[in-house]
Amino acid sequence: MSFVLPLTASTENQTQNPALFIFLGASNLARSFHGLKYCIERCIFPRPASFVHAMGPGRGYVSRGGILNAVYSPILNCGILEAVRNKKIKDQSVVALITDIGNDIMYGVSSEKIINGLQYLLNSLGEFKTNIFITSIPVDLENDISELHFHIIRQIYFPKSPVKYSQASNNIKAINKFILQSSNKKITAIDDMKQFCGIDKIHYSILKSQSAWCHIAEKLTTSLSTNVSPKFKTSELVFSIANNAARILLTDMLGIIKKTKETF
């Protein structure tokens, strides 16, 4: 009996340690960020959670990108890694999500440069003993999108992009190969997000968005020894979309409202 109490107390203390979540992505993440945050907070309650994020429509990891006059610095150069070094506290668990990879391809960045950037990011996050989750690019151009479909999407989302169909296809294959090969005990590759994509094959379908983020939230929280099933409420999805639109307009475009300390 004398050995049971210390073990139980130790386990309880471990599960009550604060957790820091690092979210990196583009439009999919930005559109559902607040709902994902609330979903995770419920799953790990009463464990304290804090969040930092770098996201935005059209955002790249190694290249500047954005939408209209909302232009974002590359995620690798936005200062979030330095902030985590200063923000992390003793015994804090760190969980990182790297998602929405692919915009850099359409900005003409080579697969080699993108892979080098991702490797640097993985190495840097590894310094914090981070549980890292990284989603592959959920599209295979040759099997999922015709060349005509590709040109239509490029004209809508990346009208100035010179990238050709074959070039994008080869880059996606190279990057996804790197992501899958990077998987280890601390890095989990999430390679099954295609099922949630909408007609453009880039963004998650509005009808499947909640399921997509519940799927990801379950992986993130399971790494913290949590067995509560994530629930992403419809009201939270609506709020997330509205909040994202307001942030893009009032903060990123007009600069009326300042960014929070958690935003990079």
What annotation goes with each model-predicted range?
Residues 73-84, 110-122, 165-178, 209-215:
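Well-ordered, non-membrane alpha-helical segments in soluble/globular domains
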Residues 171-184, 197-264:
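Histidine-centered active-site loop/cap adjacent to the catalytic His
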Residues 144-192, 209, 214, 218:
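Substrate-gating cap/lid alpha-helix
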Residues 30-33, 104-107, 140-146, 196-201:
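Short catalytic/ligand-binding loop motif for oxyanion handling, primarily in non-cytosolic enzymes
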Residues 98-106, 124-169:
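Active-site segments of SGNH/GDSL-like serine hydrolases
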Residues 20-113:
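Conserved SGNH/GDSL esterase-like catalytic core that processes O-acyl groups on lipids
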Residues 14-20:
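A short, charged/proline- and glycine-enriched loop
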Residues 22-23, 97-98, 129-136, 186-192:
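A structural signal for short, well-ordered beta-strand segments and their strand-loop junctions
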